Amino acid sequence: QKAGEADVNLVISSVGFPAAKVLEERFSTPYVIGTPVKGFAGIIAEKLIDAAWTGKSQTAYFSVTSSGKNISRAANGIYIIGESVISQSLTAAMALKQGIDATVICPLETEPEYIGENVLLFSSEEEIKAAIAEAKTVIADPIYKTICADETNFIALPHEAFSGRIYRKEIPNLMEWVTI
């Protein structure tokens, strides 16, 4: 009943996007897309304030990942496999805090509106395995470890959409989590 009273909405994962679009259409409430992860929460806060003042929706991680500034675009072989909004927010945090880039692999259906140029949309295990064959580092749900090469540095980032509740106790607080 009070959904239309918000000044702005925060879309922290792709499943919240359809609701944010409806609220924008019905009540002209802008939204910001991005997950507040360590090293990136300040950008999210800035975008929320900006969206509330301007009434314009925006994707927070585009201001970091699409600009190319703060990022070494060298072929560093870092991949994040996961849900698109969370993974792109982690990529932005890594760019801001460490000056490195990562390629996101999203195996889930997602809207093109919030997909950056560093995102690969794959639906099969074979496509993902081929893409990460030479990876130096893979950040992903533990179920993906089996398709990584032995020499790949694998960093577990459990997500219930992939491994269910098996690793629930190991899901980190992303406001405290350091990726690399």
Residue ranges and their predicted role:
Residues Q1-I180:
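An N-terminal assembly and electron-transfer interface module characteristic of large anaerobic redox
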